[in-house]
Amino acid sequence: MRLLAQLLGLLMLWVPGSSGDIVMTQTPLSSPVTLGQPASISFRSSQSLVHSDGNTYLSWLQQRPGQPPRLLIYKVSNRFSGVPDRFSGSGAGTDFTLKISRVEAEDVGVYYCTQATQFP
């Protein structure tokens, strides 16, 4: 019998108030996955996330049920201390992806993508 885990992606966006605001659209919003198999979540930004200093301040966070969010990936592809190597981040400009090479039961939760290029 195949075991399924539910990974939840969450749409994270700044409510547009002017043409300069960055809108981030994450897909899929919810994704059933099979334990031991790969999974990915992608998002697209309405404009480039490359900061004026040349860095891209894009992070991925994971929130397990009943726990606060924890940082997984920062600056697109850097794993935070203690994050398993099955998690990886990639992308550039406006398109970014979080990949899990082999889903484990402890990976169930809500995943957020955040940017620090522009604030509302």
Curated annotation (Swiss-Prot):
Keywords per UniProt: Adaptive immunity, Cell membrane, Immunity, Immunoglobulin, Immunoglobulin domain, Membrane, Secreted, Signal
A Pfam family the protein falls into: V-set
Signal peptide: 1-19
Residues covered by region (Complementarity-determining-2): 75-81
Compartment(s) where it occurs, according to its Swiss-Prot or TrEMBL record: Secreted; Cell membrane
Region called Framework-1, residue ranges: 21-43
Region named Framework-2: 60-74
Region annotation (Complementarity-determining-3) ranges: 114-120
Gene Ontology BP terms: adaptive immune response; immune response
Top-level lineage group: Eukaryota
Residue span(s) of domain Ig-like: 20-120
Subunit details: Most probably, the immunoglobulin is not assembled due to incorrect folding of light chain. Immunoglobulins are composed of two identical heavy chains and two identical light chains; disulfide-linked.
Protein name, entry field: Probable non-functional immunoglobulin kappa variable 2D-24
Source organism (scientific name): Homo sapiens
